[in-house]
């Protein structure tokens, strides 16, 4: 809906003014057969138990019937047990396929999507570096850190240099952090290669927190956020793409919102965005970028990430630095809720119950009725 409105108001405004009735919108959807029934059999069985029917597989709006069960502590505990079992399964899968030692008792925090500057994997990895620096400097005692496992998955276009640099940086940060005894058991980073549907079917059901942190106004819709919400992950995100509709349906109190709006982004562009101002004003952001620049993650070679750092400090077209403060601030809210497992899982269950709208079946019905002006075959 957000991007359809942007097309009407900005990109295709002249056409929209003349032919307003020719513009409509169909929100994406995902298939519950693959991404819940097949990928997450434990959750599927629990949903069927809670609803008393398996008809939800072909009528996903029936998930709404789970919402009253969020008040039932025993059902919420069953829901939490499903998530924990899925995390154990993913840990075993990651060890077998990649050699990763993932602790299923940590928060599994996932960011999987195409590698592009507007999707802002750089924002996530800079926040990880800042947390690492906090622990190393003693700013935060290791014992006070909530254990977190960060999982990235991405591919970049072959000629997209800055995206390739970002992938290399994430892997090098993972290498340093995962081998540092000072943060052992508190912070780990993994980048499984060749992200694909097979891996997704193991990772998505195991995820506690999903990252949807693109710059507001740049993501057309997205379907990853729908898959994660349907599988009981909480979302941290901006008001962009389908995040807007997910937040409306699951409730603002069940979504971790941060960052600038589209209007605020446009206003900052108009006044002249200077990323270096944010670098100089935020000691944690400065420390993180300086660690990238000084060779901490490139075996002491300061030239490896010169281009990436230069882009952050002089261009930063998608305002990673401007949203860094808001993004790191929301982490304390996330961790406070995660420290209350019953309440976290209650909200995660509410996400599942209110995500039925995001079925590909509903998308197809919308296309049939509003675009193609036809109906299903009898």
What are these regions (language model features)?
Residues 39-101, 105:
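Extended, charge-enriched "interface" segments that sit outside catalytic cores
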Residues 14, 19, 27-65, 205-206, ...:
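Catalytic binding pocket for nucleotide-activated donors in carbohydrate/polymer assembly enzymes
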Residues 2-4, 30-33, 117, 155-158, ...:
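Short, solvent-exposed loop/turn segments at secondary-structure junctions
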Residues 64-79, 99-117, 147-163, 184-193, ...:
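Glycine- and acidic
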């Amino acid at each position: 809906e957000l991007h359809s409105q942007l097309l009407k108001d900005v990109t295709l405004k002249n056409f929209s003014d003349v032919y307003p009735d020719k513009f409509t919108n169909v929100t994406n959807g995902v298939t519950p057969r693959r991404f819940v029934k097949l990928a997450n059999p434990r959750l599927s069985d629990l949903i069927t138990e809670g609803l008393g029917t398996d008809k939800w597989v072909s009528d996903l709006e029936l998930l709404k019937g789970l919402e009253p069960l969020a008040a039932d502590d025993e059902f919420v505990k069953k829901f939490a047990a499903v998530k924990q079992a899925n995390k154990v399964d993913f840990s075993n899968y990651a060890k077998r396929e990649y050699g990763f030692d993932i602790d299923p008792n940590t928060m599994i925090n996932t960011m999987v999507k195409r590698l592009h500057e507007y999707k802002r994997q750089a924002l996530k990895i800079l926040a990880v570096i800042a947390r690492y620096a906090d622990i190393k400097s003693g700013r935060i005692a290791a014992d006070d850190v909530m254990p977190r496992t960060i999982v990235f998955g991405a591919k970049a276009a072959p000629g997209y240099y800055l995206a390739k640099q970002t992938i290399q940086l994430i892997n090098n940060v993972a290498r340093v952090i995962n081998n540092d005894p000072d943060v052992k058991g508190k912070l780990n980073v993994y980048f499984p290669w060749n992200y694909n549907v097979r891996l997704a079917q193991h990772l998505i059901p195991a995820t506690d927190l999903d990252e949807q942190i693109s710059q507001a106004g740049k993501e057309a819709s997205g379907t990853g956020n729908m898959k994660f919400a349907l599988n009981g992950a909480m979302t941290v995100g901006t008001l962009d793409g389908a995040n807007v509709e997910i937040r409306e349906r699951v409730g603002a109190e069940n979504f971790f919102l941060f960052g600038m709006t589209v209007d605020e982004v446009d206003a900052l562009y108009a006044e002249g965005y200077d990323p270096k101002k944010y670098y100089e004003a935020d000691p944690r952001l400065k420390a993180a970028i300086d660690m990238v620049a000084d060779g901490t993650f490139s075996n002491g070679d300061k030239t490896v990430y010169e281009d990436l750092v230069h882009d952050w400090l002089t261009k930063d077209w998608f305002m990673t630095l401007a949203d860094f403060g808001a993004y790191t601030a929301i982490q304390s809210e996330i961790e406070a809720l995660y420290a209350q497992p019953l309440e976290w899982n209650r909200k995660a269950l509410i996400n599942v119950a209110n995500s039925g709208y995001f079925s590909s079946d509903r998308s197809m019905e919308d296309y049939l009725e509003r675009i193609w002006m036809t109906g299903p075959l009898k």
